[in-house]
């Protein structure tokens, strides 16, 4: 079965619909958790793998050097159905579960995490609407992403509010049937190319108001008067991704674009991460797997003292540790995705997966450069880019320190509940 765009493959939608009931429980065995893949999942995984080898890897270095947004890749991925496949079926999407979309994310990240982030960030922007939008909002804003290759963006981070979301200063004031937004956002992925944004703004000016009631989520059109993207940031890695600041000056948003209602924004924003952190972890695994493959290949070819360096125990142990990191990280994202697909809150497992995969990706990338020696420090070899690309995984969608904070709080809450 070829995963084609839903407009070109009505038969695919019918087949996915028929198999959805089975897919929803495909990871459950009589003895507990099972990660056996369905035929549909294997075919999507293979499609993403083929697309990565043929379309992404050959041009990844070019986009890294130019910093251009990979629109040609985005359009091809959209045509094949490698984008937006988590959009609900009643809107016309495939409504694939988190586990299945993570399979695709890992394969795409193997080729270039900058390009994968450009694809995945659109999913991050869409998720608040998928989780909390009403029928009209979903049809209007998710529907257009199925009609043509457009992307969305998640607009929350600010110059003074990253991990501390409660520090957001962007404000929205209600005036008649509209809300007027003023403020500045920072480090917004897809900031300059998005068709629309999910925006979190403070709607209760009382500094004593708890975050759970102080913020509201809005859908904001890119062409809204007063909305101005800044320059594209020149980042260390993942340069194919478009990252910018966004300025809001008296941006008027109709009341129809409020998600759920006033004061519900913080819950929406945080709930989004339970869905999106597993794909981020899967992306880190894709990068780590690429590092391991490149390092192993090089170690078998490069000779010192008359033998391939792979024969030296020091290198063997490094490769073994890299394999351990890849496999444990893969298991972690699979468990976190499986949990949310079972309808259970997965914050604990999602944070473990995101934190562990990010840390392992950075260590594995560093070890890959070490195995390459002087060549690893040169941009003509792939591991130099991989090491630069890896760092952001410890930062975006919640730093590794924030993930550890979430994990520890979950542990404390569980311990108190058992006392």
UniProtKB/Swiss-Prot annotation:
Pathway: Lipid metabolism; mitochondrial fatty acid beta-oxidation
EC numbers for this chain: 1.3.8.7
Name of the molecule in the record: Medium-chain specific acyl-CoA dehydrogenase, mitochondrial
Biological process annotations from GO: fatty acid beta-oxidation; medium-chain fatty acid catabolic process
Binding annotation for FAD: 154-163, 187-189, 302-304, 312-313, 370-374, 398-401
Cofactor(s) needed for function: FAD
Binding site for octanoyl-CoA: 163, 212, 274, 277, 345, 347, 397
Superkingdom in the source lineage: Eukaryota
Species assigned in the record: Drosophila melanogaster
């Amino acid at each position: 079965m070829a995963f084609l765009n839903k407009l070109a493959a009505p038969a695919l939608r019918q087949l996915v619909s028929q198999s959805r009931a089975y897919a929803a429980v495909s990871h459950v065995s009589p003895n507990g958790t099972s990660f056996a893949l369905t035929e549909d999942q294997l075919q999507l995984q293979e499609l993403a793998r083929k697309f990565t080898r043929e379309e992404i890897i050959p041009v990844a270095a070019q986009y890294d050097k130019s910093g251009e947004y990979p629109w040609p890749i985005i359009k091809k991925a959209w045509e094949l159905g490698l984008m937006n496949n988590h959009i609900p079926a009643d809107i016309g999407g495939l409504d694939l579960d988190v586990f299945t979309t993570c399979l695709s994310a890992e394969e795409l990240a193997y080729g270039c995490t900058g390009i994968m982030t450009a694809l995945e960030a659109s999913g991050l922007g869409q998720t608040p609407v998928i989780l909390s939008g009403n029928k009209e909002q979903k049809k209007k804003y998710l529907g257009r992403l199925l009609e043509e290759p457009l992307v969305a963006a998640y607009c929350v981070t600010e110059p003074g509010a990253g991990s501390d979301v409660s520090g957001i200063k962007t404000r929205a004031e209600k005036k008649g049937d509209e809300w007027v937004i003023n403020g500045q956002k920072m480090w917004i992925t897809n900031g300059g190319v998005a068709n629309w944004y999910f925006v979190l703004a403070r709607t209760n000016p009382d500094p004593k108001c708890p975050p759970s009631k102080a913020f509201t989520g809005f859908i904001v059109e890119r062409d809204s008067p007063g909305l101005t993207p800044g320059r594209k940031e020149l980042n260390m890695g993942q340069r194919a991704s478009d990252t910018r600041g966004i300025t809001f000056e008296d941006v008027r948003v109709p009341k129809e674009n409020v998600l759920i209602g006033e004061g519900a924004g913080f819950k929406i924003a945080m709930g989004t991460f339970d869905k999106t952190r597993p794909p981020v972890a899967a992306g880190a695994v894709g990068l780590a797997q690429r590092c391991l493959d490149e390092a192993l290949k090089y170690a078998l070819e490069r000779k010192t003292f008359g033998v391939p360096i792979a024969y030296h125990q020091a290198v063997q142990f490094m490769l073994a540790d890299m394999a351990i990191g890849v496999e444990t990280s893969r298991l972690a994202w699979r468990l976190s995705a499986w949990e949310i697909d079972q309808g259970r809150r997965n914050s604990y497992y999602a944070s473990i997966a995101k934190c562990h995969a990010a840390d392992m990706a950075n260590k594995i990338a560093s070890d890959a450069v070490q195995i390459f020696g002087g060549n690893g420090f040169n941009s003509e070899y792939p591991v130099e880019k991989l090491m630069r690309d890896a760092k952001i995984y410890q930062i975006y969608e919640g730093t590794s320190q924030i993930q550890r904070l979430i994990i520890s709080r979950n542990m404390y809450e569980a311990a108190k509940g058992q006392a």
